[in-house]
């Protein structure tokens, strides 16, 4: 069943579903309870793939050669790597670097998303609305806000059906350059499988500035859609402040989405966190995925240590100008 951290009542304050496929969502919601135990916590906190420059770099020293970035990240993560059956994958990107590269650890390893997939669901919904030349309806916006800000699972059920479930998600992923993400079976959106690198690609599609935010710009999220997702990720409820936000500079704004799921077969936890943080004036996109954690608390501690190490490695070349 869903974890107890999702304190918002599924339907409280929301209108009755008026979206395509909502007739099935009530039945689907009950089935989804047996498949995923997902939630999120937050507020305003491969081989590396070459990415186009998103804007002028902030003052700093030259970035390390791209072939060394993965090795630098692996070295930084060494002290925090889990033991036993716990698995970890991390990816990080300096959005304001002149020579952008995704540095990754655990390349190609897939994890179940839990509630971080809610960002992908919203991205797919917005792409479909763009294609239809319309804005989101009042109901869609209410569901989107509940799904991202409070990680409401019923809202995710409704919007998962609205986008066409795994097929609709897959179409959006292709447009946004996510190559290793596969939608969960049936109504099991929380069982979608993804990689840390793909999640940074999705974050780049949201947070990069200008038309280069998408691998295929004419077909990606437009400026209004990116701003909307970023706003919701930056206004997650205060009680949900954990995960990659721990890696940001004190007092800086951040945006994130977390997810967790306890597997009924093993009792072990999947703990994931994705988002944007700012350090030394640079914006970093961070994705930390983990599985096989003995408890939710242990998983959160691991994710936060990994996020700090990843941003530390990525920001080692950045130094503020002397005053």
Question: Which residues does each predicted region cover?
Answer:
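Penicillin-recognizing serine hydrolase domain
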Residues: 2, 39-88, 93-97, 161-323
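N-terminal export and membrane-targeting signals
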Residues: 2-29
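C-terminal motif of bacterial Sec signal peptides marking the signal peptidase cleavage site
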Residues: 34-37
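Short, glycine-anchored, charge-dense loop/turn motifs used at functional sites
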Residues: 94-102, 121
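Amphipathic coiled-coil signal-relay and dimerization helices
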Residues: 99-107, 254
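A short glycine/serine-rich beta->alpha loop
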Residues: 105-111, 185-188
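Active-site SXXK
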Residues: 110-134, 147, 286
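Conserved catalytic neighborhood of penicillin-recognizing serine enzymes
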Residues: 129-179, 195
